[in-house]
Every structure is written in C-alpha cells, then in structure tokens.
Amino acid sequence: MSLWLYLAIGAGLLAVLYGAVQTASLMRASAGNARMQEIAAAIQEGAQAYLKRQYTTISIVGVVVIAALAFFFKSWEQPVGFALGAILSGAAGFAGMLISVRANVRTAQASSESLAKGLSMAFTSGAVTGMLVAGFALLGVAGYYYVLLATGHEATGRVVIDSLVALGFGASLISIFARLGGGIFTKGADVGGDLVGKVEAGIPEDDPRNAATIADNVGDNVGDCAGMAADLFETYAVTTVATMVLAAIFFRGTEAVSAMMLLPLAICAVCIVTSIIGAFFVRLGKSQNIMGALYQGLIVTGVLSIPAVWYVIHQLVPTAVEVDGRSYGADALFYCGLAGLVVTAAIVMITEYYTGTGFRPVKSVAQASVSGHGTNVIQGLAMSLESTALPALTIIVGIVVTYNLAGLFGIAIATTTMLSLAGFIVALDAFGPVTDNAGGIAEMAGLPPEVRVTTDALDAVGNTTKAVTKGYAIGSAGLGALVLFAAYTEDLKFFSENAAPGSFFHGMGAVTFDLSNPYVVVGLLFGGLLPFLFGGLSMTAVGRAAESVVAEVRRQFRDNPGIMTGEVKPEYGKAVDILTKAAIREMIVPSLLPVVSPVALFFVIQAIAGKVDAFAALGAMLMGVIVTGLFVAISMTSGGGAWDNAKKVIEEGFTDKNGVLHKKGGETHKAAVTGDTVGDPYKDTSGPAVNPMIKITNIVALLLLAVLAHGV
C-alpha cells in the first residue's frame, strides 16, 4: 500500500476530527433566552422529522438497487460500494442539518453581542459541515479503495473500477433525492408563506403570526444545508472516482498506473489541510466587511493549495509518462490543477456579479420593479439567460487549456483540484441558512431591532454565498460530468476491444458519435430534453406544495382572528407536516427520471437498430444532458438569486433612476416579492437539483456498461 493512500485516509479523519472539535466548541456557546430556545427547538424537531422521513423513503429505493447490483454482479463489492456511498452521502447531509439547527440560535445570541461574534459563530458551523462533507467523501473513496486492494483485487481490475463507480452511484442517488426533496420543502414554505404573509396580510418576513414561519426556517436547513451538503459530497466523490477510473484505463500496463490512480486522492487530501488552515483566517477586520472576511479565508485556502498541489503532483509523477503518443508530465498536470483553481475563482466572481446587490444585474431587476410585476419578471428572466454566457465561456477556456496540456486526464485533474476546495466552499454555503435562521429567530423572539440589523447584514451576505456556491457546484458538476462521459467512452472502448467470445460486447466493433448517424441525433435530443422536463416537474412540485401552504395559512388566519392580534400562536406544526408529506410525495418521479432514462433509451434503440447504435445514442444522450443541464442550472440559480436580492435591495431602500426612494411595503416592493416567488424555486429547487441529475445519468450509463459486460 502506498503512503499517499494512508495520508488520504488520514486527511479524511483529520477533517472529521476538526468537525467534532469545532462542534463541541460551538455547543458550549449560549443558546439565548427561553423564547429563543423554544423557537430553535421547533425548527430542530421539524428538520429532523423531515429528514428521517426522507431517508426512510430513499432507503426503500436503495435496498432495491442493492439487490439489483448483487443479482447482476454476483459479488459483494459493488453492492457494498453503493451502500457505502449512499450512507456517507446521507450522513453528510444529516450531520450538516444537525449542526445548522443548533448553530442558528447561537448565532442569533452572538449577534446580540457583536457582528464579529455573529459572523464567527455562523461560519464555524458552516466550516463543520464543509469539513464533514470533504472528510466523509475522501474517507469513503480512499477507505474503500484500500479495502478493495487489501482483499486482493488488482488496482486496474474491473472489480475495483465497478465498485468505485457503484459508490458514486450511491452518493448520486441520495444527492438527487436530498436536493430535490429539500428544495420542494423549503420553497413550498417560502413561497406559500410570502404570498399570504407579505402580500395578503402585509406582515414582515419571519413574523411569528405567520403559520409557515417555522416551516420556512426548517426548509432552510433541509434544503440549503442538508441538500447542498449531499450535492457537493456526491460531486466530490463522483469526480474523484471518475478520475481514478480514467487513470486506470489510460495508464493500464504502465508502471505509473498506481500513482496516477492515487493522484486525485492525494490532491484532495492536501487541500483538506489547506481548507482547515484557511478557515482560521475568516475574521472581521476594521472595515466590518463580512464578504471580505469570508473571501479572505477562501483566498488563503486557494493560495496555500497551489504549492501543495505542485508538491503532490511532482512527488507522484517524478518523470513524464508516455501513453499513445501523449506525454503526461508533472508540470503539465500541475498547470491543469492550477487551471481548475482559476476556473473556481472565475465562477465565484461571475456568480457574485450576477447575484450581488452592488452590481448591474440585481440593480436592473430592482429598477424594473418600479414599473410593475410584469417588468420585474421580464428583467429577471433576461438576467437569468444572460448569466449563462460568462460561466460557459470560462468552462470552455478551462477545457481547451487542460485538454491541450494533458488530454482528458488533464480535464479530470483540473476538475478534481476544483472540487478539492469543496470543504471551504460548503462552509460558505452552510453559512447562509444559519444566518437566515438567526434572523428569523431574532424576529420571532422579539429581540431588539439592532440585533435584527446585525442578522440582516449577515443574511444578505449569506444569500450571496449561497448563490456563489451554487455557481461553483454547477460549474464543477458540468466538468465532472464531462469526466464521467470520458470514462464512459473509454470503458466502452475497453469492453469492445477486450470482449470474450460469447460476451455481450463480442464482435460489436467500434462505436462512433457521428452526427450523420440519426441515432446520435436522437440521443442528443433525448438527453437535451431531460433537464427541461426535470426542471418543469420540480417547479410544478413547488407550486403544488406552495398552494397547500397558502390554503393552510389562510385557514388559520380565517378561523382564528386572534393570530393577527398576537393573542394566539399559530399551529406551526400543521404547515411543517403538510410540506413534509408534499415534498416526499413529489420528489419520487423527478428523482427517478435520470435513473430510468439511460436504461430505457439503450434498450429501445437496441431493439430498433442494434447494440452499436444503442451505445452511440446513449453516449449522445449524455452529451445532451451535460450541455442543456449546464445552461438550465446556471440560468435558474443566477436568475433566481438576482430576483431575491433585488427584493432585498428595495427592502433596504432603493433609489430609482429618477431619484425616487422605494421601501418595504410599497408597490415596487410588492412587484419585487412577485419576482422573488418565481426566483425562489428557480434558484433553490430546480436549478441546484439539475447538478446531481446530470451526474447520475452518466453514472447509470457507466454502471450499465459494467452490468452488460457481466453477461446480463
């Protein structure tokens, strides 16, 4: 066993240890007065009840998949890999939720003391979630790779490759359910609560008289925290696995194959250490710039990662490796890793530009709100479409540069390096729901107005960090899916060239993705429609969930007038229960769409035109999903973020181009609320859920190849 494999496992354990130590420190902080603790307890109870029901539902699907893998592969390694990926992905999300629902009330209390203490508390809780995500993912992949080698399997053998792919499938399946189910819950509560509370009743956000308030705060945790944690766990694990699979295929038969397979694990290991160091640099300076404090930690992490990645690559690849006429040298691979870090920085800046309150896109949506509801929606849609251009161009440049440096393996190394910072990026994301909840608790507990000013300042930054991390997740998902597609084409080539007589692939010949083949066009079109259909199903699900919340909140206002006067407390649990049932019910069909579609397309085309065209159509489908999925996801998340922050700009006081001041409660604000209700499911449900949808489609295609190769 290589020392680097032990170091990767050790880095995973270090991340988990960091999480445990910081959690203990966080739990020692004051949880505020009795009223604050009562509200926090209600949020905790709702979040835990929802996630338990969600994971119970997912486990039923998981058991079916495990049984299918055991039947097809007739060995323990692949089913165990799937179970490990699923359990760790679920654990990452659940742990993130457990931390955030305890940090929210402590952040509210810390914010009553100072902005610096509020920032420190919120970011610490986010860092715990981030390091647990990175730690669990690295432990899962490196640990299971160690077990497979220790049980006598060859590193480049099909058992190791198929088992690691199965691990990625387990992570992907949990991720899409968590992302979609959590998104339906949180946006059903948010949209439903806003429509009745803000628009109809004229009461502010997080007002305790709104029966959907607790459900909204529960949703922040199960959607933005648990959902994002599972999403980035899956992207981290799947990309690492895909890079290892490519290394096993590209460098099979060379002395460098073991080192190349360890390279993604080693890069992730050193970047966990740099992320932990960077977390200690998040401090509020004299300027009181919250975003600057967070970026300070991110910059330190990125700067430290550069020499760390250089060292790892030069240790594992001391001399250039020649394969099929291409040279893979340490310097070329390092520049690929550096390109991954540059792409990360560029996507972060671009996303902040399109969603930050100080820039043209958000201001233009706020200005459009002056004219009314329709113009707000038109401008928001315009920004959502425009926001796809720069991220796509950034990814294009990244692909061209890394491919010319080191081919498809160079793209894989760039994506791995990009994702190696996931620990810190998740910390930025989990910061958002904690600050949002802290503001809600401060409002409901009746804390002094200056506390709400502090939590609002943190929440405004939290909205931007959530948008930024979504941009990062989408960009990394797009590149990660490209790596998976490369693994599909290389696996297909391997099985075709090494098929035993009588096997499924024997005598099949080469598969090409030629646009003159109508079945390739069919695959492209079929793959291209999936993100749109998936987005439509998830948006419809949020609409239905919101309708049920609107009906319940209206019923409570109508049946109990004492709620509006503050004499009677609403039945918060009713809205939570309604949303829990709705989210679980609505998430099933969209989540299974990317699992069933590749299998269905393959067998339908095989029946019509044969194996070669079926594999060509399936590969083209993967390309179609990647291209349209990337644009749909970016458009939805950035556009939704612009709508959300345009509303916040107006609530803080917006001066239009004619010098007129617009504030909360006016017609301009009502128009902005309408835009926000459209943008909410855009940015927090449909858009983010497209990420795992893209990757799970590719993972299923990879597993299908392995199953067919086993003689099914």
From Swiss-Prot:
Q: Which residues bind Mg(2+) 1?
A: 190, 194
Q: Which cofactor does it need?
A: Mg(2+)
Q: Does the keyword Nucleus apply?
A: no
Stretches that traverse the bilayer = 1-21, 56-76, 79-99, 130-150, 165-185, 231-251, 262-282, 293-313, 330-350, 393-413, 414-434, 467-487, 519-539, 588-608, 614-634
Question: Which residues participate in substrate binding?
Answer: 187, 683
How is it placed in the membrane, per its record?
Multi-pass membrane protein
Cited InterPro entries: PPase-energised_H-pump
Q: In its keyword annotation, does this UniProt entry include Ion transport?
A: yes
UniProt site positions, description: Important for ion transport = 179, 224, 231, 684, 695
The family line of this record is: Belongs to the H(+)-translocating pyrophosphatase (TC 3.A.10) family. K(+)-insensitive subfamily.
Q: Which HAMAP family match?
A: PPase_energized_pump (MF_01129)
Q: What name has this protein been given in UniProt?
A: K(+)-insensitive pyrophosphate-energized proton pump
Supply the source organism for this entry.
Caulobacter vibrioides (strain ATCC 19089 / CIP 103742 / CB 15) (Caulobacter crescentus)
